[in-house]
Amino acid sequence: TTEELEELENEVVSKDDNIKTMQEFVSPESLYQELIASVKKYHPSTDISLIEKAYKTADTAHKGQVRKSGEAYIIHPLCVAIILAELELDKETIVAGLLHDVVEDTVMTVEEIASEFSEEIALLVDGVTKLGQLSYDADKVEVQAENLRKMFLAMAKDIRVIMVKLADRLHNMRTLKYQSREAQLRIARETQEIYCPIAQRLGISKLKIELDDLSLKYLEPDIYYDLVDKIAVRKSVREKYIQGIVDEAVSYTHLRAHETSAHL
């Protein structure tokens, strides 16, 4: 649609590799501060103690784990939580974002999360963990459809589970360049076929557009970079046009000011 094209025009260039993608190789502590600032922006009076506890818990649980990029694993859940905060989601969802991988990738259990935090947060994390266990095979349409049905069922139980999973997938797509080419194609295709339609169904255009954009980047790189170039040119032309109008307005204002002073 025209709206999606305009949003893509504003965002696509900034997603390229030579531009800083979200929070790559930034210290965990600075990311945590960014997360808190983002939450307080839309919920100034929120009690951050639970978020802080979740951050420390996840940091301890993932200690020693490293992503393929070489950065500490805790960077990933922090970035997921920041994406959720940008969508202005509730504190429990932010906490679930921070903890979303501890059951799958560490020794921590759902029962421990329920005990340390709450049953509500434990259910969110458990839901995300179960979604992560769904397999996808692009060559088997029936399996793909079944995955979609399961995701819709999970969405019906608590939409926040899907929100965390979408944020998780978005950050993984933003850092997909560190994966093998085979993994890039598999993950990008899965994103295009499963996650983009879910984001569209939920009406989250911001996530849907970026997921579409990043999928195209790996599935059809020639088309993607051609689009990036065209958008960059179009944006440059538009900026020059706007600057020309501004310059004319400034010149006119100066001229009027000069004429006024001459009459005094």
What is each residue range found by the language model?
Residues T1-R256, S261:
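Active-site helical microenvironments for divalent-metal-assisted chemistry
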